[in-house]
Amino acid sequence: MSIDNYDWLKEIYKNIDFDKLPHGIIISGSKGLGKRLLANEIATKILSKKLDSNELALINSNNHPDFFKLDKEKILLHHITYRKDKWDDEKGQRNVNDFLSVTPSISNNKVALILNAQTMNAECQNALLKSLEEPAKNTFIIIVTDRNKSLLLSLIHI
């Protein structure tokens, strides 16, 4: 699914200056507005400026080595940073901070897309702060939330 059927998303997307994109992006709004679609389009553009069909297939199947999509009903600390004895059945020990610490593999950039960010507690958000405050070169973090007020001010103002 793409933003082509949603005029309001196309309008937002076409006004994004990808040459001046900040490394941290928060997309916030009510459920059902298309935030996930917009976030996926932005991530795709960051990773694949030429829109190569092979890269698009990797992104769409969540198998792109430079794309990390965190889509959990509740985001826990071990999803953001490594904690001993915590195992993620879906991705092994892979977490956002570890992913962002490695240089890009096949793209010029890396993107971590965090969905349902409103479910992160303060400890999770603080663990993410270091990656936002001191981003590695060519890394982008896209945070999607239904409730902007659930995010720490320190996270929002970076």
Task: Identify what each model region corresponds to.
Residues 116, 143-148:
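A short beta-strand-to-loop transition that corresponds to the Sensor-1 phosphate-sensing loop
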